[in-house]
From Swiss-Prot:
GO terms for biological process: fatty acid metabolic process; sphingolipid metabolic process. Catalyzes the hydrolysis of ceramides into sphingoid base and free fatty acid. C.elegans contain specific sphingoid bases, which are unique or different in structure compared to the sphingoid bases found in other animals. Two examples of these distinctive compounds are: 15-methylhexadecasphinganine and 15-methylhexadecasphing-4-enine. It comes from Caenorhabditis elegans. It is an enzyme of class 3 (hydrolase). GO terms for cellular component: lysosome; membrane. This is Probable acid ceramidase. Its EC number is 3.5.1.23.
Amino acid sequence: MKPVAISLSLLLLVTLLPGSEQRKVDNPDFQPNCLVGGPDIYDPAQSEKVLWFDVNLDLPPRQRFQQIAKAYKKEIHAVFDVLNYFLTIIPGVNAWELIGNMTASALDKGMIMNPYRDEVLGIAEVLDVPLGNLVFLNLFYEMSRFCTSIVAQTEDNKDLYHARNLDFGQLFVWDIAAQSWGLTEALKKVSVNINFFKNGKLLFKGSTLAGHVGVLTAMKPHKFSLSMNAKVQPDIINVAKWYMGAYENTDLQFVMYFDRWLFENCDDFQCAREKIAGVKLLTGAYFILGGANPGEGSVLVRNTTSVQFERKLFDGANDWFLLQTNYDPDKDPLFIDNRRDPGNACMNKLTRANVGMKGIFTVLSSKPNLNKTTVHTVIMSVTKGYFETFIQKCPNPCWAF
């Protein structure tokens, strides 16, 4: 088999295993545990454990993320080690090297647009790692995230809160000591917050993982907020075609790079909504969008070319909030991964009168929305400008994913 064929097969393996029903093991018969009404678990001081960095978008692209890479060099190498170890399941094949070489070739062909290309180059210089593997890590985050996102309007219609759990790392090496997934634990240690500046002014705030130049969750204070959840079945065929050069010289966007572009180019909810609806994407996704005005909250279900469906605040039974996991709203979730129903029940137990940083954090700290793959929780208030990130840990007994 030719190297490119081997590499594409490995790519399929790495991206499909986390979402593969065949590889999933039934969760124990744990009952959902909504913490609303119990002891107060919200401690804003805990969010200080996730460090803040400033990224100046007026700097040359290669320099923008280098300070973060320097601060987390050891921890990013640990993420590489987990992926490399996982790929040793294929005997006699250096899978990590093959994937890295193929991704580096895609970069050389100009298949990743600037400024993101040069930003990744700058990070690789600091980390002293193979460029192709770092680029693959950026693409890997594009395809494999299991999350819960919530937007909720307060009872007086004055404030909107937006939050998300980032779930990542299922089936990537069980860490016996930590009683968690090895990749999940490694990603907790590279979770960072960033203030993005342009022309000397704060442009927006975001959370991401050190070594990545996109954003996972972001907010432009007093303007709009966004989180993005992956679909349970990624558009892996499109990714394979991209690797083979089928999308060269097009306006195709990577989702998390597009998220950042959105905050650099939009100044309100409506602009963001229109851009999300019109962009051509490499993979489908769920865009959870919040605004500064009453009722500005939507979940846009995207395929690669258009909006399939949109859910809006005040448009249905749970009209004051929207909760989105990794399944289309009109389809039932996989029976061993039903975070939607327990999450909705916990939000209804919270009630609209208790929507706030504390209340939403409590819901997202409730099982099974909190599980062994939960890396961190981000809570934002568009109207108040709050942005807090909390490293999470799911105590046993806990769902594996």
